[in-house]
């Protein structure tokens, strides 16, 4: 199995210009596979403004820039892909909008069936969770780490673990077989700061 990698999710609300240096410092502190811009229920103008500010600094570091929920905006704003939930744009429509070469990831909660369907349809990754309590959003489901192990044994499509992940809880998910750890509060609210959090997560994921 390849090393687990960090998948950063932006805070629920922020000023793009003020947040940019913090994000840059976090990306420079260790390996990060991708950054997901998640501004739930924000107007299109706010989302596009955040993309305009953050996408260049993310992509300049060879890190993928993913937009949450909005394949239409992702396609027109130069994002590397989109992440869709079960109540968002269906996978096939998202793929049509962003194109064959873009990344499309799908939330599958704790459902093996949803994950199998997403994988068979062509999703670039599936996301399971929430594994731990989270203050970022109200989780619809609680997932058992065993689902990561099962997925690794069954499928080649990468899996992302999400939900309340901290430096302290990460080892369990790494050992269970997560390819990526999707982290929000565990980085941005880390006592020593986001850059220290990224460095700590990298140490944990390298064993």
From Swiss-Prot:
Keywords: Magnesium, Metal-binding, Thiamine biosynthesis, Transferase. Mg(2+) binds at residues 69, 88. It catalyses: 2-[(2R,5Z)-2-carboxy-4-methylthiazol-5(2H)-ylidene]ethyl phosphate + 4-amino-2-methyl-5-(diphosphooxymethyl)pyrimidine + 2 H(+) = thiamine phosphate + CO2 + diphosphate; 2-(2-carboxy-4-methylthiazol-5-yl)ethyl phosphate + 4-amino-2-methyl-5-(diphosphooxymethyl)pyrimidine + 2 H(+) = thiamine phosphate + CO2 + diphosphate; 4-methyl-5-(2-phosphooxyethyl)-thiazole + 4-amino-2-methyl-5-(diphosphooxymethyl)pyrimidine + H(+) = thiamine phosphate + diphosphate. GO terms for molecular function: magnesium ion binding; thiamine-phosphate diphosphorylase activity. GO terms for biological process: thiamine biosynthetic process; thiamine diphosphate biosynthetic process. Gene3D superfamilies: Aldolase class I (3.20.20.70). Its EC number is 2.5.1.3. Disulfide bonds: none annotated. 2-[(2R,5Z)-2-carboxy-4-methylthiazol-5(2H)-ylidene]ethyl phosphate binds at residues 134-136, 164. Pathway: Cofactor biosynthesis; thiamine diphosphate biosynthesis; thiamine phosphate from 4-amino-2-methyl-5-diphosphomethylpyrimidine and 4-methyl-5-(2-phosphoethyl)-thiazole: step 1/1. The keyword Lyase does not apply. Pfam families: TMP-TENI. It is an enzyme of class 2 (transferase). 4-amino-2-methyl-5-(diphosphooxymethyl)pyrimidine binds at residues 36-40, 68, 107, 137. Belongs to the thiamine-phosphate synthase family. Condenses 4-methyl-5-(beta-hydroxyethyl)thiazole monophosphate (THZ-P) and 2-methyl-4-amino-5-hydroxymethyl pyrimidine pyrophosphate (HMP-PP) to form thiamine monophosphate (TMP). This is Thiamine-phosphate synthase. It comes from Rhodospirillum centenum (strain ATCC 51521 / SW). The lineage of its organism: Bacteria, Pseudomonadati, Pseudomonadota, Alphaproteobacteria, Rhodospirillales.
């Amino acid at each position: 199995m390849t090393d687990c990698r960090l998948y950063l999710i932006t805070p629920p609300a922020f000023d793009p210009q003020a947040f940019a240096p913090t994000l840059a410092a976090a990306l420079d502190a260790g390996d990060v596979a991708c950054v997901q811009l998640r501004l739930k229920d924000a107007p299109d103008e706010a989302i596009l403004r955040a993309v305009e500010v953050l996408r260049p600094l993310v992509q300049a570091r060879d890190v993928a820039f993913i937009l949450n929920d909005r394949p239409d905006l992702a396609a027109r704003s130069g994002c590397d892909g989109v992440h869709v939930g079960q109540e968002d744009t269906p996978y096939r429509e998202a793929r049509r909008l962003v194109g064959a070469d873009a990344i499309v990831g799908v939330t599958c909660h704790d459902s093996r069936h949803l994950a199998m369907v997403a994988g068979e349809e062509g999703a670039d990754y599936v996301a399971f969770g929430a594994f731990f309590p989270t203050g970022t959003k109200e989780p619809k489901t609680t997932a058992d780490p065993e689902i990561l192990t099962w997925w690794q044994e069954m499928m080649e499509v990468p899996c992302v673990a999400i939900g309340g992940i901290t430096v302290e809880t990460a080892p369990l998910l790494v050992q269970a077989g997560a390819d990526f750890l999707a982290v929000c509060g565990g980085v941005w609210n880390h006592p020593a700061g986001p850059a220290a959090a990224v460095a700590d997560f990298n140490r944990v994921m390298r064993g």
